[in-house]
Amino acid sequence: MRSFEFFEHTADVGIRAYGKSLEEAFSNAALGVFEVITDTSKVKPIEYREIYLNGYDLENLLYKWIEELLYYYDSELMVFSKFDLMIDQDSMTLEGKAWGEKFNGKIHERRTVVKAMTYHQLSIEKTENGYVITFVVDI
């Protein structure tokens, strides 16, 4: 199963992420976002940021997850390549760690700045193979 792919969207970037579990799909969604920003294969999981989020549904939880990661990019220039998380669908909570390092122009390719997560075309679908998450980020 592929982890994520991009799809065409006027002036923004569409991402479709896959996972056998919801956690894997959320992780791959985040990886897709950071692949827009830089080549994540060159991002070493040196530091981590702990993340605790509450949402009112899965879509809101995904929105907050991506926004939280973008906050760390905007405020600390952190880029991430590895994610360990747990999602409790009963309480609609996410907790985990995002692993990466500070962006370094000598090591990391500067691609496109992701301004924000959006609710545009946001969907989380359970399939026979796991989960498919579709969303658009503002660039």
UniProtKB/Swiss-Prot annotation:
Question: Any one Gene Ontology biological process term?
Answer: tRNA splicing, via endonucleolytic cleavage and ligation
Q: What InterPro entries is this protein classified in?
A: Archease, Archease_arc, Archease_dom, Archease_dom_sf
One GO term in the molecular function aspect is: calcium ion binding
Chain residues that bind Ca(2+): D12, D138, I139
Is Lyase included in the keywords of this UniProt record? no
User: Which Pfam families does the entry link to?
Assistant: Archease (PF01951)
For the keyword Transcription regulation, the answer is no
For this protein, the record's SUPFAM superfamilies field holds:
MTH1598-like
Keywords on record: Calcium, Metal-binding, tRNA processing
Family assignment from sequence similarity: Belongs to the archease family.
Q: Per its database record, what is this protein's job?
A: Activates the tRNA-splicing ligase complex by facilitating the enzymatic turnover of catalytic subunit RtcB. Acts by promoting the guanylylation of RtcB, a key intermediate step in tRNA ligation. Can also alter the NTP specificity of RtcB such that ATP, dGTP or ITP is used efficiently.
NCBIfam families reported in the protein's UniProt record: PRK00407.1
Protein name (database record): Protein archease
